Amino acid sequence: MSTLGHQYDNSLVSNAFGFLRLPMNFMPYESDADWVITGVPFDMATSGRAGGRHGPAAIRQVSTNLAWEHNRFPWNFDMRERLNVVDCGDLVYAFGDAREMSEKLQAHAEKLLAAGKRMLSFGGDHFVTLPLLRAHAKHFGKMALVHFDAHTDTYANGCEFDHGTMFYTAPNEGLIDPNHSVQIGIRTEFDKDNGFTVLDAGQVNDRSVDDVIAQVKQIVGDMPVYLTFDIDCLDPAFAPGTGTPVIGGLTSDRAIKLVRGLKDLNIVGMDVVEVAPAYDQSEITALAAATLALEMLYIQAAKKGE
């Protein structure tokens, strides 16, 4: 069975065209791409409303609304002229086999990184970040984490496949350094001794974007950074289509400005997760996710053009 593809026995989770209508390449390891987009249609680790397996398809579908703009406002260049980005489709695994998904995703990521590519991944529920972190840590060593979310996902008593436990597991496996990591937009109960710097939603909404970014840069330093964005970081007014929405979150405008502010960090991997289109209204959650993903690519292109 191929590791990647856009057709499968249950092909309704996948698309036949790439994010932003970027080229499709199901053998990205031998390509000349700088960044490779991978969809991970998985939601078996969800504790709330399921449906995140349809997230990659929804993000790709709505991204056609963004593809027409050559110079994404307010950037003064076309990202596609600076970065070679391909979409390698969705990870193919036996639906119902969470372990196979995790192992295949980690192996896929390790192969891409060994070939000199960087990854932007679309979930799927947030558990998919853990196998991605395992692969990135093998290649880059211990990393800093910049984590946008309503939840810290540091629950210690979950099961093996649980979208609320990744950032308890990752420090224990030596994948990330919590002392150089920051969690942004949190507004649910969490353990205060988990080692992460937590910038709760109230702080982030009340402080200036520049002030928040300055603190993030100070915490992260020059470490390699993995950037993960759970769409429920946004207030449900801007992102209702997710499994565990929490009132009182960030606006889409503030989130975009914060992501842009991360341009100077040494970001080595990125993902956008937890889009569940069955609960969306007018595709606004998928559009927010696609826009944030595009901004992530733009900050990489901006750095390359310096």
Curated annotation (Swiss-Prot):
GO molecular function: agmatinase activity; manganese ion binding
E.C. numbers: 3.5.3.11
Database matches in InterPro entries: Agmatinase (IPR023694), Agmatinase-rel (IPR005925), Ureohydrolase (IPR006035), Ureohydrolase_dom_sf (IPR023696), Ureohydrolase_Mn_BS (IPR020855)
Superkingdom assignment: Bacteria
PROSITE patterns in alphabetical order: ARGINASE_1 (PS01053), ARGINASE_2 (PS51409)
One Pfam family linked to the record: Arginase
Family statement drawn from the similarity comment of this UniProt entry: Belongs to the arginase family. Agmatinase subfamily.
Protein name listed in UniProt: Agmatinase
Source organism (scientific name): Klebsiella pneumoniae subsp. pneumoniae (strain ATCC 700721 / MGH 78578)
Encoding gene, per UniProt annotation: speB
